Amino acid sequence: MDSEHIVFRVRNEIVTLKPEVISDQYEYKYPAITDKKKPSITLGRAPDLSIAYRSILSGFNAAKLDPDDVCSYLAAAMPLFEGVCPEDWISYGIIIARKGDKINPSHLVDIMRTEVEGNWSQSGGADVTRNPTVAEHASLVGLLLCLYRLSKIVGQNTANYKTNVADRMEQIFETAPFVKIIEHHTLMTTHKMCANWSTIPNFRFLVGTYDMFFSRIDHLYSALRVGTVVTAYEDCTGLVSFTAFLKQINLSARDAILYFFHKNFEEEIRRMFRPNQETAVPHSYFIHFRSLGLSGKSPYSSNAVGHVFNLIHFVGCYMGQVRSLNATVIQTCAPHEMSVLGGYLGEEFFGKGTFERRFFRDERELQDHLEAEEAKIDIALADDATVDSGDEDFYGGESRSPEAVYNRIIMNKGRLKKLHIKRYRSVSSNHQARPNTFAEFLNKVYSDDN
């Protein structure tokens, strides 16, 4: 009999079958480009820029914008922002430009056009007979791109924050080298009619293209990034959090991973560091893989690496970081166990690189300081009030070594010490906890009642 079959009895009948489950139709897709073809989209017929400008500006003022027309205009306006490539620009084997080449955002992607005409209307702008200047085009492009950033601001109690951001954006695009083309508060009013535009693939694609261009090319209108910067490492929260974590504890990726004492980290680490993905290559297509449509289900999101994400932010909470306290817990990824490991790692690395003497009069003074610090560590290891003298062999020569931390956890039977719980209570009780955040989790799990 096939080893994949099972046999059982139902109402005096012997049943033999092969258990099968639904295959995952939404597997993680890695962004690496293997066919050496630039990311591409298809838009309608390219418009006359002057007509398109007047039509889009009229629609902007009336808070009635057609997304297809906006995308067509944004693509047509790309040649206005020509710049010089500072170095050879190559990503995934694709030669984007050579050093000294004149390029504009359209050189980064392939934009194909059909013969479908846009719904262009000159109403509200027909009385303007002159052609708009480059500065006017830049202002309109900038305001349109800002619609993307505003649509990415979601959550409770964000109305005032969003309004303030929109006002600041308007100020940028009415100050030289830009020119004022709309009245105050128009951007926020129009955004309310376009609140979900970040979900429109073509619009997201063009916003990401502009951001990739201006992040590399020094340009008069580089401030256009104020509306596009959110496309960089979009849907990449897990990997971005891990990078910030390394800076916080001042370790290399390899050394940090040695502290990840949980079996569920294995698959996530393999997923996050798959070879040939250009995760560490500056100005790569990887940085904008989500907006450019290179990955439908990101392997680098917080949900894709939930155990890593939870651990990083529990360590951040222990260190009192507001960003971590406000982050959303991935409830399906062992938050209780991650909070225990986070407490031990937080204790080991808390304050490292914060209050330390770093500068000295000469090399001799530096050497004396290092020797004094080593002596302090030896004394602490000899009697740190937490380890029995007979257990010192578990700790080796370094209190922060992975072996030392691991053995402390095992000797405490995988439970937090009182000082860990006290610290968690302290940082969470002084913070206004939002629903489903790490602050709320710590308040509930490690409260006095529990």
From Swiss-Prot:
Keywords: Capsid protein, Helical capsid protein, Host cytoplasm, Phosphoprotein, Ribonucleoprotein, RNA-binding, Superantigen, Viral nucleoprotein, Virion. It is found in: Virion; Host cytoplasm. Phosphorylated by host CK2. Unphosphorylated protein N seems to have a better affinity for leader viral promoter encapsidation. Phosphorylation of protein N in ribonucleocapsid may stabilize the interaction with protein P, thereby playing an important role in viral transcription/replication. GO terms for molecular function: RNA binding. The keyword Coiled coil does not apply. One of its GO terms (cellular component) is helical viral capsid. It comes from the Viruses. The keyword RNA-binding applies. SUPFAM superfamilies: Rhabdovirus nucleoprotein-like. The modification Phosphoserine is found at residue 389. Its main location: virion. Homomultimerizes to form the nucleocapsid. Binds to viral genomic RNA. In nucleocapsid, binds protein P and thereby positions the polymerase on the template. Protein P acts as a chaperone on free protein N to prevent it from aggregation before encapsidating genomic RNA. Displays a superantigen activity in human and mouse, activating mostly V-beta-8 subtypes of T-cell receptor. Belongs to the lyssavirus nucleocapsid protein family. Encapsidates the genome in a ratio of one protein N per nine ribonucleotides, protecting it from nucleases. If expressed without protein P it binds non-specifically RNA and therefore can bind it's own mRNA. Interaction with protein P abolishes any non-specific RNA binding, and prevents phosphorylation. The soluble N-P complex encapsidates specifically the genomic RNA, with protein N protecting the genome like a pearl necklace. The encapsidated genomic RNA is termed the nucleocapsid (NC) and serves as template for viral transcription and replication. This is Nucleoprotein. It comes from West Caucasian bat virus.
